[in-house]
Structures are given as structure tokens and as C-alpha cells.
Amino acid sequence: MAELVCDALATLTRNTYGDNDESAKFCRMFRTMIRDSGLYGNIENWRAAFYRERLPKRMSHSTVSIQLDNLEREVLKIRAEGFCQGYTRKERTLNAFDLSDDGKGNTIIKPTTHLSSIILQNSYNSAFKLPKIPDGLLEKTRYELEEEKKNNDILKQKIKELENTISQLENYENEAKASQFVLEHLKFTNESLKIQRDEAQICLIGLCNKFGLQCEIDNSIHVTESDKKGKRKGRKNRRIEVSFGAPGHDLTEQISTLSDVE
């Protein structure tokens, strides 16, 4: 549709000022101007809406009214400018028709625009009417739009919940990494303490052998006198546990703790 407007203006310019470079330059500037201002796109969009949908999608009633009003003003302005150049209603109407052949050798008038097709229908059919919007279509579209809005709100809520869940899982992951680091450190410390325990037990056994004592290492450490010593009269034959350290300071308990390292 916008190209038809450009072609009409180009035809008028060539007929008025001649087919020269200045006329061609003016037509190019006009096409650039309507593209830059958005008029070109508006005309094409409304033409597509009229042919395919009758009403554009995703427009409120007020937006449709404003767009129709703007389109009407733009068309009237173009018609007014064309009229000043001698492009009257008669010329505009006749320019929308072309001569053609019906295939049987008969010359016929062929409409080139949607409006010219309507004019031709009105010429021989007085009862001709444009099809109306199907009953209930607007209400159905509005209901579907509301349902889509509800679904969109639900999806937004779900996305927000998923974002919170992801954030919580990331926190759990960080805590797990920190716990893993602590466990690795404790494992290393435990291994070091086991080595120290084994070394201390070896040293203790060596000392016991040196001084003729017996050292029993199980879940705990017990150091007793050797069985090689003679029995004492009047007493049962039992081992006497040996205490270490200065008087009042018993090291046996401290030595026993060496076997508690797991």
C-alpha cells in the first residue's frame, strides 16, 4: 500500500515536472521521508491487518482508535497534497483501475487495489456489504488474552521460585565444599596424630625393654614390672603397674591417651 502511494506521487511528479533527474530525486526523498517517519510501516501494517485479521493483535480499544485516527489524518494529508498537484478524486479513483483481458478477447476493467475492488462491487451490486467481525470474536480474544496473562503471571512466579531454589542449592554447595575442606583437614590431622602415636608407642616399648618392664598396648597402654623378678612372700603373684613422673604427678594417664588416637 505504501508503495502504491509512492508510485502515485512519482507518476504525478513526472507528469507535472517532467521525467528528469530532479523528479526522480524528489520521489526518492519522499520514499525516504515516509520510511523515516514511520508512515510507510504504518500503512503496510494496517493494510496487512485489514486483509488478514481485520483488527491488529495486542491492541487495546483506545490504541486502535488512536491508530485509526492517525492513519486517517495521514491519508487525508496525502490526498490534500495530491489535490494541490491536480490529483483529484476522479484521477485517484481511475488510477486504481487497469485495463485487462478476460482470456476470451474481451477488454475488462481490473481493480488494482482493495478499495477499487469494493468500488467495482458497488457499481453493479447495491446490496454489497463488507463482512463484519464474527460475533464473539473480540470477547473470545479478550478472554484468551486474560488467560495468557494469568499463565504468564504463574510462569513468572515459578521462575522466581526456581531462582530462589537455585540460590539455596548454591548455598548448600558452598557449605558442602567448606565441610569437605574441614574433613580433609581433620583427616590429615588424624593421620599425623596416628604417626605420632605409633612413634611414641615404639619409643615407650624401647624404654620398657631397656629398663626391664613389660608394656601392653591394646586399647590402652599398661606398663608393669617384668615377670622375671621373684615372687614376694605372703603376697599373690601379680604384676604391679608402674607409675612415672615425680611424686604426685602421674604420667600413666597421659601415656594412655596416646592409644586413643584413631
Swiss-Prot record:
Coiled-coil region list: 138-179
Molecular-function annotations in GO: RNA binding
GO annotation terms (biological process): regulation of translation
CDD domains linked to this entry: NSP3_rotavirus
Gene Ontology cellular-component terms listed: host cell cytoplasm
Biased composition (Basic residues): 229-238
Main location: host cell
UniProtKB keywords: Coiled coil, Host cytoplasm, RNA-binding, Translation regulation
Renumbered residue ranges of the record's region Disordered: 224-248
Keyword Coiled coil: yes
KW Coiled coil (keyword) present: yes
Annotated InterPro entries: Rotavirus_NSP3 (IPR002873)
Location(s), subcellular: Host cytoplasm
Family membership noted in the UniProt record: Belongs to the rotavirus NSP3 family.
The protein's role, per its UniProt record: May play a role in stimulating the translation of viral mRNAs.
Name of the protein described by the UniProt record: Non-structural protein 3
Source organism (scientific name): Rotavirus X (strain RVX/Human/China/NADRV-J19/1997/GXP[X]) (RV ADRV-N)
